[in-house]
Every structure is written in C-alpha cells, then in structure tokens.
Amino acid sequence: MKKKHLLKIIIAVAIVITAAMFIYLLAGNHTAADEALWALSDTDGVTVANTGSGITFTPAENPHSTGFIFYPGGKVDAEAYAQLAHGLADEGILSVIVKMPFDLAVFNSGGAGSVIDAHPEIKTWIIGGHSLGGVMAADYAAKDDRISGVVFLASYPNTDLSASGLKALSLTASNDGVLNRGKYDEALRFFPRDTIFYEIEGGNHAGFGSYGAQDGDGGAAIPPAKQQETAVRQIMEWMQG
C-alpha cells in the first residue's frame, strides 16, 4: 500500500512539473511588433516565403552566392527579425530565419541543415543568431563544415571555436541590460581567433529584433530599425572584408 501511495505521489508531482513546463513554454513569448510586418511582404528586389519551418528572403539577384541562416532569440517570434533578414536580402544575401518549437532554439539547433540542403546553389553559408539563438548557432557551426562563419547578436559561444578557422562577427549594444556581461567576457576565449567585435552605440538587447520591450533591458537611444540597419551594414562589411 505504501509503495502504491508513493507511486501516486510521484506521478502527481511529475504531472505538476510537466504542466508547469508547458505553461512556461507557452507563456511570455515576444511576438513581432507591427513595424516588422512590412518586411514579410514581397518587394521589387526580395521575395518572401513564410512557411511552417522558416521564413526565406530570396533576393532577385545574389551576386555573392552567399546564404545567411538566422536563429531567433529565446521566446521571440521568428517574424520579429524580418526587417533584419529583409535588409540582408536587399543586399543580395539569401536569408532564412529558422522557426523554433516553443520559440526556443534548443529544440531545433540542427535546423540549419535542412536549409543548406534545400539551397545547393549557395556556395558560402553564414549562420547567426540573437541571444540564445546565437549560442545554438555556434553549436551548429562547430559540427557542420559547410558553415564558413558565425554572427553573434548579443550572444556568445558555449562551444570552443577558437581553433575552428571560422570567421566571426560579434555585435553588441551599449545599452543592453539583458546580455550577461560576465558570461560574455568568460566566453571571449571561445570565439574564433579573428573575430571582429563591434558595439552599436545607443542600442539595446531587444533592438536586434522588433518585438517591443524586454524585461531587464536598458533603454535604447535609437529605434530598433536603426539598430538593425547598423547590424546589416556591419554584417555586410564583415562578409566582404
């Protein structure tokens, strides 16, 4: 009888924990702000395909034969990064935002593989991500030699990439109140050796996307659109450098 009673307690606790996890996963997600939604539409130079697995921004011309795969930040809707991806496509870069289960890249860290397989015309692949997305993007880059470089937006690698030979760009923002600077500094030894570091003055954590304010973040002195324009410019200069 005691064993049966203990088993019932264990099952009840497991149910409560599981329910709590699902509530956490489904609650508090950041949806795309209205100003990002225009970027989900086709323009003269970019065609947008929004599917269940991701959002693809295809430029009318891709003189670079380069593709950019992007992993969203934790609990942030993929559409919140449409302006950033559209901006890169305007510069001739095929850009794909990978959608994540529960908006958490840890549940689809290998999503870049199917993107690469679907675009054999692309010769050079760059992967990047915001916050948690950047961590998972770095993990993927360490495992797939088809990746040539990594872009970190308010993020850092947990995997040691120092001897990987990968190109890398680290973009941070001066008013970011979410990025753990202590962990970022500790992770500096894991960045590829020739990583380029650039801080966007006046930007904050949420400004790398368009999804409104984020708890704990600093106030931005520039709008998200300006921060993302700066990010696009820095990414293009780094790619072409």
Residue ranges and their predicted role:
Residues 84, 179-189:
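Short alpha-helix in the alpha/beta-hydrolase fold that links the catalytic acid
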Residues 85-105:
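Conserved alpha/beta-hydrolase
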Residues 1-18, 22:
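N-terminal Sec-pathway targeting helices
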